[in-house]
């Protein structure tokens, strides 16, 4: 039996876009027509007056706008509770206008040089040194990217991620995918001592050196502290090509820095277009007119929902490609807002898949939910629905009306938004016109500035994460890291006091 042929199915537009990038063809991202067609839209149609308890009213905005505008001015002036170890952590907000074409060119040249030598690229990092890179690549490439031919990938290597967890099976399975291939890596860590990433790097560095000896240094990029740290010392000793983790930008805000841009460039993504999206959203979010500023409106909408008793934010998308962006938001908001008993739990969801799982809870469960939709308006591909002579499933009305999967998938947002709103769930819709680097850049900047404003509204520093250090301290003690002996003894004493209950 022969293999299946895609009879009547057109070329995959995502693959065509990847090939175009590989040939140097670009979107006209500086043109006004492109920007108008790709303007991100914040839709509050289903936010106000949801039935039941905890409804948000327009007058609630009026009471909070003065405080939001004060936060807006403080943030613009780099004032307020924004410091980490004496450094103001707001370098991200002007990065779109500070980054130079020369620096972007250096990143692209280094990325292309490495990509030309390898079959597979491994990005090593965790948290903010991982999620934004993975989310952006996933958003802008074929969902089975590594299974495509190099030509279909646009001439770029396969892309893998390690150092983001400690699962030995995942790590070993990834090594199987790399076996027999020429591999390049980029290790991303400010200190070089982040446990998960450092262990992954140690293993990968040994493998590269075992295979290619001194030439391994040509296959290793390092993104780390500009002046100090264990990883910087090693990179200087070995002669690795280095990029910088900025001092004034925290990990979850770092996707526009070298942290994110190097990996995106290796994947063939147009980082100039990506920067342009950040830049244009920054311009909108510096606007002093509240209702013309999507970052301010978004921050106030979420804060009012929190004040009204919403403890869970479902971030749902109708796009598999954008699900990684929802996961990026899952770090950005809780790590910035989860202080002093504050904050909403962020739950990413892919619709319509999750509508057949937690959709019942959203519709009829406790009314402590805010729903945010990352709504992709136009997918890359238009997959037609064929007529069927028997029509046993009753779907012939779709092709009869020239309605395809793209249309049905749009209703996967519009239908649930209406139903959930009528069930008492306020909804925010962020309308993303198309899958391109410009739009992903817009989303990131809007979310970063929104969560910064949220920190001011909540009354705490959104740029630190002291709670994360608690798990690290306990883990270091348990694995026997030098310097944590006393804390390990304290943990053991505490554990002995507690009854061991195992079933």
Describe the predicted segments one by one.
Residues 112-288, 477:
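Glycine-rich phosphate-binding loops that contact phosphosugars or nucleotide phosphates
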Residues 1-4, 452:
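Short aromatic-glycine-(Arg/Gly/Cys) micro-motifs in beta-strand/loop hairpins
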Residues 312, 320-432, 437-442, 448-479:
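C-terminal catalytic subdomain
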Residues 211-371, 467-503:
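Active-site phosphate/pyrophosphate-binding segments
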Residues 11-30:
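A short, charged, amphipathic alpha-helix used as a generic interaction element across diverse proteins
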């Amino acid at each position: 039996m022969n293999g299946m042929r895609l009879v009547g199915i057109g070329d995959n537009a995502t693959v065509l876009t990847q090939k175009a990038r590989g040939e140097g063809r670009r979107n006209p991202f500086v043109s006004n027509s492109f920007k108008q067609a790709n303007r991100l839209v914040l839709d509050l149609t289903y936010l106000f007056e949801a039935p039941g308890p905890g409804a948000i009213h327009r007058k609630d905005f009026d009471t909070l706008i003065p405080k939001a505008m004060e936060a807006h001015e403080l943030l613009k002036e780099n004032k307020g509770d924004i410091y980490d170890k004496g450094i103001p952590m707001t370098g991200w907000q002007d990065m779109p206008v500070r980054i130079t074409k020369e620096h972007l060119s250096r990143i692209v040249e280094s990325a292309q040089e490495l990509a030309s030598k390898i079959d597979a690229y491994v990005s090593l990092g965790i948290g903010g040194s991982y999620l934004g890179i993975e989310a952006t690549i996933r958003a802008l490439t074929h969902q089975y990217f590594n299974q495509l031919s190099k030509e279909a990938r646009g001439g770029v290597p396969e892309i893998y991620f390690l150092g983001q967890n400690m699962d030995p099976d995942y790590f070993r399975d990834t090594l199987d995918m790399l076996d027999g291939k020429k591999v390049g890596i980029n290790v991303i860590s400010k200190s070089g001592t982040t446990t998960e990433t450092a262990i992954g790097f140690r293993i990968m560095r040994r493998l590269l050196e075992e295979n290619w000896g001194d030439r391994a240094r040509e296959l290793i990029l390092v993104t780390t502290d500009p002046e100090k740290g264990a990883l910087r010392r090693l990179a200087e000793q070995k002669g690795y090509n280095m990029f910088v983790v900025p001092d004034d930008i925290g990990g979850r805000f770092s996707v526009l820095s070298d942290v994110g841009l190097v990996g995106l460039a290796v994947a063939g993504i147009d980082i100039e277009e990506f920067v342009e999206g950040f830049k244009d959203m920054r311009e909108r979010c510096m606007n002093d007119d509240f209702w013309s500023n999507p970052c301010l409106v978004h921050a106030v909408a979420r804060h009012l929902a929190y004040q009204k008793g919403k403890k869970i934010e479902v971030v749902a998308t109708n796009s598999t490609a954008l699900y990684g962006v929802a996961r990026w938001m899952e770090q950005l908001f809780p790590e910035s807002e989860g202080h002093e008993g504050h904050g909403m739990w962020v739950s990413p969801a892919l619709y319509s898949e999750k509508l057949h799982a937690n959709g019942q809870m959203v519709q009829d469960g406790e009314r402590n939910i805010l729903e945010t939709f990352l709504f992709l308006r136009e997918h890359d591909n238009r997959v037609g629905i064929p007529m069927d002579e028997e029509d046993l499933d009753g779907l012939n009305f779709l092709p009869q009306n020239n309605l395809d999967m793209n249309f049905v998938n749009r209703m996967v947002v519009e239908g649930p938004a209406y139903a959930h709103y009528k069930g008492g769930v306020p909804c925010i819709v962020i309308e993303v016109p198309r899958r391109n680097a410009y739009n992903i850049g817009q989303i990131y900047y809007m979310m970063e500035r929104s969560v910064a404003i949220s920190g001011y509204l909540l009354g705490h520093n959104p740029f630190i994460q002291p709670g994360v250090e608690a798990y690290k301290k306990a883990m270091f003690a348990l694995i026997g890291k030098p310097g944590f002996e006393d804390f390990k003894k304290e943990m053991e004493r505490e554990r002995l006091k507690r009854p061991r209950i195992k079933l």
